[in-house]
């Protein structure tokens, strides 16, 4: 999944400081998402990782708020409904884990992703929540679960 993240983020100009590509957990997702109230899901086709997404407690946020994190897909997996299915799976997992709100950060230019989030019921926020360290992101959304 680290390779997917490192392939996709530069496509959108998101490779510098303040972006998730630089998070230490990128190389250790299985460790980061084995924590309580966290989960990560991976899309694999013919043995190749094509994308994934996870949820975890929002750093610096209320305990009933999770963050949708590291949702990225290689180009060949986009436009087929995979993102919609995986997003729904993450939302259902967040509910099962007892969260009441799901937050996410993205950026200008990730228009398809923002459309997907809006279609799923996420609402735009005026500013960031928590302390994710992703100061380069400029779009914020939340979904009441």
Predicted segments — roles?
Residues 47, 81-83, 98:
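Conserved G/P- and acidic residue-centered "switch" motifs that form tight phosphate/ATP-binding loops
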């Amino acid at each position: 999944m680290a390779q997917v993240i490192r392939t996709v983020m530069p496509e959108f100009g998101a490779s510098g400081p303040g972006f998730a590509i630089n998070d230490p957990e990128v190389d250790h997702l299985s460790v980061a998402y084995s924590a309580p109230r966290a989960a990560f899901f991976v899309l694999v086709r013919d043995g190749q990782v094509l994308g994934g997404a996870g949820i975890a407690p929002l750093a610096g946020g209320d305990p009933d708020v999770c963050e949708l994190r590291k949702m990225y897909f290689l180009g060949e997996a986009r436009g087929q409904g995979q993102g919609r299915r995986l997003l729904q799976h993450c939302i259902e997992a967040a509910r099962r884990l007892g969260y009441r709100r799901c937050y996410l950060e993205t950026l200008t230019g990730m228009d398809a992703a923002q459309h997907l989030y809006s279609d799923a019921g996420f609402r735009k926020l005026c500013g960031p929540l928590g302390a994710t360290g992703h100061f380069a992101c400029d779009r914020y959304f939340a979904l009441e679960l």
